[in-house]
Every structure is written in structure tokens, then in C-alpha cells.
Swiss-Prot record:
Pfam families: Methyltransf_5 (PF01795). Residues 294-346 are annotated as: Disordered. Residues 314-327 have a biased composition (Basic and acidic residues). It is found in: Cytoplasm. It catalyses: cytidine(1402) in 16S rRNA + S-adenosyl-L-methionine = N(4)-methylcytidine(1402) in 16S rRNA + S-adenosyl-L-homocysteine + H(+). Its main location: cytoplasm. GO terms for biological process: rRNA base methylation. This is Ribosomal RNA small subunit methyltransferase H. Specifically methylates the N4 position of cytidine in position 1402 (C1402) of 16S rRNA. It comes from Azorhizobium caulinodans (strain ATCC 43989 / DSM 5975 / JCM 20966 / LMG 6465 / NBRC 14845 / NCIMB 13405 / ORS 571). The gene is rsmH. GO terms for cellular component: cytoplasm. InterPro entries: RsmH, SAM-dep_MeTrfase_MraW_recog, SAM-dependent_MTases_sf. The lineage of its organism: Bacteria, Pseudomonadati, Pseudomonadota, Alphaproteobacteria, Hyphomicrobiales. One of its GO terms (molecular function) is rRNA (cytosine-N4-)-methyltransferase activity. It is an enzyme of class 2 (transferase).
Length: 346
């Protein structure tokens, strides 16, 4: 997840980060930036991928981030690169509109690095980390309901569903019940307060994942509508890439990777024919897979940056076929999330 998204040797949900770009060599190899080309980095963070792209070729980069702190922190890189970098405060589901507004469409490449950044984890006041006491916030763009709002407002069944669906937490019902019981005594407004509640329900052996990891993941994804945003960004990239343009996506857990895998699988297959319908109708493939399956980090990278162990990279090249209609995108999401996109815009 770029400089500011890769983290160091402690737990990804809360420890101090060293800001190491994850799978940087693999990202550059699959993105293949060109001189005079234009690439879009949809998740700027602290600019690790963006800087590397600018150093790899004498082209232009448009970098997007929904977090205003990241945009402010990138101004020095804008000045350093002599006008080849444009920073935009926006959600990456709108990346096609950003490129069009800047007169940069169609694009030669799009890179997406999904999830929370280590900068956000490092700042206790952002409320992402269960290891750092802070307000239970988790909003990447400081708009809309916070994690504390969800914890206060969702009923027990809804909480359990969020924690199970978005955190893949098998103790979701017990955790939801504990949250409801605890909030009846006093409001849950601090990160460590919630982490303590979860830790009393989920036990972990020394060296295992912190008990609150999956619950925090679920709330963060829900607060920021991360899966809906990812689906929107994939479709936006399909619309704005030129033929031969590359899409590279790095994910860090199975929910994200499954969406990317299914999207690229569907977009890279020709319509199926059968003896009943020998001339199958349907959209032509809009992508060609560059990486056959997921690319994973090497052992040396994982040893130096343990968070990289869960990273998966998928890459594809745009064909000259028209973009597919958006009607089938909802199938990439859990059913109850497919109708919730676009409630908020930062």
C-alpha cells in the first residue's frame, strides 16, 4: 500500500509503521509506466507508488486520496517533481471523472492500493487503531457517521451482521451482544474501550492476531463504504483506461481480493456459447489478464515488512472493447451492500 500504506513489524491494525511500499517492484513491472504517459494512483497515501512511477518514467501522475491529510502532506512532492504530479482530494470511485476534468483521459495506467494507510493507523486521533487510545472515529475523510455512531446506533443483529460480513469474525454474535450490553452502561466512544470489550469475548493465544482485529476491520470498512468504493473504482478504471492501459490492484484481505478477482475474471472472458446458443451474445472482453492469478510478495519482502504477507496483486490490460454496463456490478458485493453506494461524497 505504498509509502504510508505498507507498515512495519508490528500488527497491521495498530503498531508503529515504517511506511514501506508493498510489492513496489511488482507494481511497477505490471503497471509499466511510459515516458509521456499518464498514470493515476487512486490511493496516494504518503506517495510511495506515485514517487516510484515518476522516477520510473518521464510521464505524468494524477494521485487521488479521500483523506485531506494525505493531500496536504503530498504538496512537497508536487513541487519536487516540477509539475508532473497533480493531487486531487476525491474518492477513487470517481477517478474517471477526475481524469476527464483534468483533460488526462484516456489513461495509460491505474494503480489501486486498498485499505487503511499506516499514517492513519499511526494517528491515535483518527481512531483506526485498537492499540492506540483515541476517539472511535475511523473516517478516512471526516464525513458521515463514525465508528462510534455505528456502535451506538446499530441493533444487536445489525452489529453481528456487519462484524461477520465485513470482518469475517466467527464470534460476531457474541461480540455484538457484548457491545450492546456495554453501551447500556455507558457510551462506547474510545478505541481501547471497544478493544477491551471485544477482548473479553474473544481470547487469543500469545503471538496470535489481536482479538479486536476483525471487529475493527469490519467497522472501518462499513464506515468508509470501502467495498462499494472498490467496485466503483474498478468500473471507473475500465471506463477511463485506453486500449493497452494497465490496471494494477493490491489488496490485503480476502473480501477485497475476491471482488477484484471476480471483476477481472468476468471482464476478461468472452460470452459463453452452447449448442442451444452457438452464437452467444454479450459484451466482448474489456480486459486481458496480465497476471494469471494473484501475485504474492516474496519471502524477503515479508521478512522485512510482515504486513506484506497478506498482500495480493492482480493486474490486467485494457482491450479496445467498450466498457461493460454497470448493471452487473452489484453482484460483486454482499446483497445488503449493493444498494448503499454513493450515500456520501467527500
Amino acid at each position: 500500500m505504498k509509502t504510508g500504506r505498507g507498515v512495519g513489524p508490528t500488527d497491521a491494525a495498530g503498531g508503529p509503521a515504517r511506511h514501506l511500499p508493498v510489492m513496489l517492484a511488482e507494481v511497477l513491472a505490471h503497471l509499466a509506466p511510459k515516458d509521456a504517459g499518464t498514470c493515476l494512483d487512486g490511493t496516494f497515501g504518503a506517495g510511495g507508488y506515485t514517487r516510484a512511477i515518476l522516477e520510473a518514467a518521464n510521464g505524468r501522475v494524477i494521485a487521488i486520496d479521500r483523506d485531506p491529510t494525505a493531500i496536504a502532506g503530498g504538496q512537497a512532492l508536487v513541487e519536487e517533481t516540477g509539475g508532473r504530479l497533480t493531487l486531487v482530494h476525491e474518492r477513487f470511485s470517481h477517478l474517471d471523472q477526475v481524469a476527464q476534468d483534468l483533460g488526462a483521459a484516456p489513461l495509460d495506467g491505474v494503480v489501486l492500493d486498498i485499505g487503511v494507510s499506516s499514517m492513519q493507523l499511526d494517528e491515535a486521533d483518527r481512531g483506526f487503531s485498537f492499540r492506540r487510545d483515541g476517539p472511535l472515529d475511523m473516517r478516512m475523510a471526516n464525513d458521515g457517521p463514525s465508528a462510534a455512531d455505528l456502535v451506538a446506533d446499530l441493533d444487536e443483529v445489525e452489529l453481528a451482521h456487519v462484524i461477520w460480513t465485513l470482518g469475517e469474525e466467527r464470534f460476531s454474535r457474541q461480540i455484538a451482544r457484548a457491545i450492546v450490553n456495554a453501551r447500556a452502561e455507558s457510551p462506547i466512544t474510545r478505541t481501547t474501550q471497544l478493544a477491551d470489550i471485544v477482548s473479553k469475548v474473544v481470547w487469543a493465544k500469545p503471538g496470535e492476531m489481536h482479538p479486536a482485529t476483525r471487529t475493527f476491520q469490519a467497522l472501518r470498512i462499513a464506515v468508509n463504504e470501502e467495498l462499494q468504493e472498490l467496485v466503483g473504482a474498478l468500473a471507473a478504471a475500465e471506463r477511463v483506461l485506453k486500449p493497452g492501459g494497465r490496471l494494477v490492484v493490491v489488496t490485503f484481505h480476502s473480501l477485497e481480493d475476491r471482488i477484484v478477482k471476480n471483476f477481472l475474471s468476468h471482464r476478461s472472458k468472452a460470452p459463453s456459447a452452447s449448442r442451444h446458443m452457438p452464437q452467444a451474445e454479450g459484451p466482448a472482453p474489456s480486459f486481458r489478464l496480465v497476471a494469471k492469478g494473484a501475485v504474492e510478495p516474496g519471502s524477503d519482502e515479508v521478512a522485512g515488512n510482515p504486513r506484506a504477507r497478506s498482500a495480493k496483486l492482480r493486474a490486467a490490460e485494457r482491450t479496445d472493447a467498450p466498457a461493460h454496463p454497470d448493471g452487473d456490478l452489484a453482484g460483486l458485493l454482499p446483497a445488503d451492500l449493493s444498494q448503499r453506494r454513493g450515500r456520501r461524497r467527500s
